Every structure is written in C-alpha cells, then in structure tokens.
C-alpha cells in the first residue's frame, strides 16, 4: 500500500496536484498496518491527514478503528486511547459523534471527548444524548 500511495503522490505532484484522499479500501490498509505496527509514523500521518472528515466510507472505517482504540477494545502501539479520542474529534461530526458521547463515560477519555465535542458544531440531534448524560456526568 505504501509504495502505491507514494507512486500516486509522485504522479499527482508532477501534474501540480495534491494527492487524492484515501478511499475505504486504502483506509482499511492503513488501519491494518497501524495494528501490525508497520511504519507507524507514515501510516499515522495518513490516518490523521489523508482521510476526509464527514460521512463517506473511508471516514466510517477511520471512526470505527479510532473508536475501538479509544474504548480499549483494540490495541495500537502508536495511538493511545486519549489520542484516538482526539483524532475522533478532528473528524468534525458524522460517524465520530456517538463515539465521542460514549467516551464521556470512560475515565481515560472523558476529558478529551468533552473537549472534542465542545469544538464540534455538527452534532445535530445527538445534543439530546449529551444533555441527558449531563445529569450524571460532569464532562457532558
């Protein structure tokens, strides 16, 4: 995946174009490489900067992976629970919102999730979940 991506970047640069965002298949490959601990710095950079925020299939893969790391269900050497929560917050809404709301209930991630949600304006009807949670959760 890395070689193909670097080739793609080179071809785009020759035409004075930025590389395209990753698609769902490429994002899954990035996730698999991060899980295996292969070239963490390169793949973490791709996960952080080359997947568009929003609700496309690549964002779905990214949010699912980061949620599993943030909740402690998946181990990734290069991403802590807090950093996974932070990265979810950079997705600007969509698939990350329900995860961030759930992460308010985990001691390790509550403060980071709170900060992330406070900067997200695209939470739509999920604000009701935060309001309900605020009756018993100081971070909500």
List where the protein language model places each region.
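Charged, low-complexity interaction regions
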Residues: 17-21, 38-39, 55, 73-77
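An N-terminal, globular interaction/scaffold subdomain
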Residues: 39-53, 60-62, 78
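Structural signature of alpha-helical solenoid repeat scaffolds
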Residues: 47-51, 89, 118
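Amphipathic alpha-helical packing elements
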Residues: 2-31, 36
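Amphipathic alpha-helical scaffolding segments comprising HEAT/armadillo-like alpha-solenoid repeats
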Residues: 24-31, 53-72, 91-104, 122-134
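Conserved hydrophobic register position within alpha-solenoid helical repeats
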Residues: 42-43, 80-85, 113-117, 140
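Alpha-helix N-cap/helix-start positions at coil->helix boundaries
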Residues: 40, 74-78, 94, 106-111, ...
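Eukaryotic acidic, Ser/Thr-rich intrinsically disordered low-complexity regions
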Residues: 2-5, 115-140
């Amino acid at each position: 995946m890395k070689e193909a991506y670097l080739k793609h970047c080179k071809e785009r640069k020759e035409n004075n174009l930025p590389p395209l965002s990753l698609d769902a298949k490429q994002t899954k490959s990035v996730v698999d490489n991060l899980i295996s601990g292969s070239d963490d710095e390169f793949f973490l950079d791709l996960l952080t900067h080359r997947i568009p925020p929003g609700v496309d299939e690549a964002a779905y893969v990214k949010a699912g992976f980061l949620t599993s790391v943030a909740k402690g269900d998946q181990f990734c050497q290069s991403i802590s629970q807090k950093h996974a929560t932070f990265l979810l917050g950079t997705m600007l809404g969509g698939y990350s919102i329900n995860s961030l709301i759930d992460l308010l209930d985990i001691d390790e991630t509550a403060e980071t999730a709170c900060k992330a949600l406070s900067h997200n304006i695209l939470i739509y009807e999920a604000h009701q979940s935060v309001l309900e949670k605020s009756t018993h959760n100081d971070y909500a």
